[in-house]
Amino acid sequence: MCPARLRTPRTASLPTHRRSAMTTANPLNTSFTSADAAELYQVPNWSGGWFRVSDKGLMEATPAPGLHASLRAIVDEIVDRGESLPVILRFPQVLAGRVKHLNEAFQAAINEYNYSGHYQGVFPIKVNQRRAVVETVAAAGYDYAHGLEAGSKAELALCLAQKMHPDALLCCNGFKDDGFIKLALWGRTLGKNVVITIEKFTELDRILKQAKALGVKPAVGVRFKLHARGSGQWEESGGDQAKFGLNAYELLRVVERLKEENMLDSLVMLHTHIGSQITDIRRVKVAVREAAQTYAGLIAAGADLKYLNVGGGLGVDYDGSKTTFYASMNYTVKEYAADIVYTVQEVCKAREVPEPVIVSESGRALTAHHAVLILPVVDVTGPTRNLEDQELTVPGEDSHQIVRDMYETLENISMRNYRESYNDAVGDKQTLHNLFDLGYVTLEDRARGEALFNAILRKIAKLIQGEKYVPDELEDLQKVLADKFICNFSLFQSLPDNWAIGALFPIVPLDRLNEQPTRQATLVDITCDSDGKVEKFIDLRDVKATLPLHEPGDRPYYLGAFLMGAYQDVLGSAHNLFGKVSEAHVTVRPGGRFNIDLFVRGQKARRMIESMGYEEPMLRDAIEDQADAAIGRGTLTQEQEHELLEDYGEELLGYTYLEYES
């Protein structure tokens, strides 16, 4: 990670833009409060109590009762230290709190139903392999014997090095070669409770062969393809066509094969999984019932299973709607735990088999809440910004007739004719462009006409705001008129799921939340890619096309993208060679105070370039050779060469994102 920069970077203050009366997206409500902002951005619905809007209009982290810290204050402290943005804020207390919340939910259900077994969670590190995340989960889960799950050799090597409770599970999932299996078996000799999951039938003989060669008795689990499927975007992960797992015939063959080897007692776990982010609790109950019946069937076949692993899928309510929408979930963690415990117990009692240790592989639900991506707004563009007053004055006789027609449309818009006015404006704009292409309209008239068109749309938008019925052709008007807030980040690096699968994340300003937002906006990143934009935002009833934001002023304006701790850290791509962003690990203290315990600087430009096969000395030599040639041609002086090489070297060692001098 990068060393500290020599200069002091700051987020640039935004220019104050001139606006006509028609550019305000919402009528100003002078009684707007922090409570209104909390409702507007749905903070109580998605935050789970880990974040809140304060009475002073600040977004705060609230990792425990009585603890709170302003995110704006944390970011200001980072900037004051001379560090660069963007940055991810990590709250280990929130992460530890999520581990506790999950385990206590299952324990409460076990107590309520007098369940004779117990619960052991497993964290699949593929969700976030960052050291701070894995070590925090392992430490917070130690007293609960909360384990880890690895799906590759690299992940297994990482997991084996962690300090874990002796009873904590280390589940080895995914496809395996001999090296993977050997490493897992060596883990058992280290005292780790390693269980190797059979994902396909042919893996069984590999496991038996390596176990005999090493003289280590394996503990084996078997993944079963449930007929039941999940809900939401990952529904296809389950069912008969699932990527992983054995069918019923293969499951029974595993039992027979282990009997032949006199090793049936090595089969300790049944593993099932119906997909990530399950939105509907009914799907969970159906799947758990099928899994429990399968468990009972294996017991009847002679297996002495200890664990029933119901897999992952515990969701996160990203939009706060508490529905079966793909970005939500219609249940709580408490309900999830209670339904699993109750269903397993009901089946076991009916089939008269022992109640197993219940295992779940929850990752998203543990990690999502702990991380916030800070998005510095560096500029704003939009169809109604930077319009000069004279552009909306009465066109002169030298203006083309089409421009004068558009001005007349603007002047005469009313509730009675706004639809007709809109259609006239659309037609006039098309005519304007056609005439320009033919050379009959000047560039100045085109600029006036486009400004008038945008003013017409803005006026119509104000007229129909709050109307119960809006004509179909005007439904997207707000999106068309929206500002584009340019944010200093890469969507592909830091919000990859938004780009790849349309995932929604709550986005909220860090401060000014006791002021009513007056702009409707979409967000764009700083990559040279048209896909680098956020145009869908959470809403209680639907997906919003725009996000209400404030007019930026002289003070830097920051947005927070919340629930960022699951998958985003590990799925990001190096598009345009934008690297991993910096991260601050923050502990919240009493009295609104906080400590930045660790600051990890984001990736250097040099590191990103070297990842593509280049070497820094080679690059420096190439630039120096070109500079020497330029001196020979007389286009560069020796003094300029020194400055050029210094600047080039400084940028190689610098952050890949935009930096501004204070």
Swiss-Prot record:
Residues the entry annotates as binding substrate: L308, N309, V310, G311, G312, G313, L314, G315, V316, D317, Y318
Coiled-coil positions: none
Biological process annotations from GO: arginine catabolic process; spermidine biosynthetic process
Reaction catalyzed: L-arginine + H(+) = agmatine + CO2
Top-level EC class as recorded in UniProt: lyase
Alphabetized GO MF terms: arginine decarboxylase activity; metal ion binding
Modified residues (N6-(pyridoxal phosphate)lysine): K126
Keyword Transcription regulation: no
Cofactors: Mg(2+); pyridoxal 5'-phosphate
Gene3D superfamilies named in the record: 1.20.58.930, Alanine racemase, Lyase, Ornithine Decarboxylase, Chain A, domain 1
Enzyme Commission number(s) of this protein: 4.1.1.19
Record's keyword terms, sorted: Decarboxylase, Lyase, Magnesium, Metal-binding, Polyamine biosynthesis, Pyridoxal phosphate, Spermidine biosynthesis
NCBIfam families, alphabetized: PRK05354.1, speA
Family affiliation: Belongs to the Orn/Lys/Arg decarboxylase class-II family. SpeA subfamily.
Known role: Catalyzes the biosynthesis of agmatine from arginine.
Official protein name in the record: Biosynthetic arginine decarboxylase
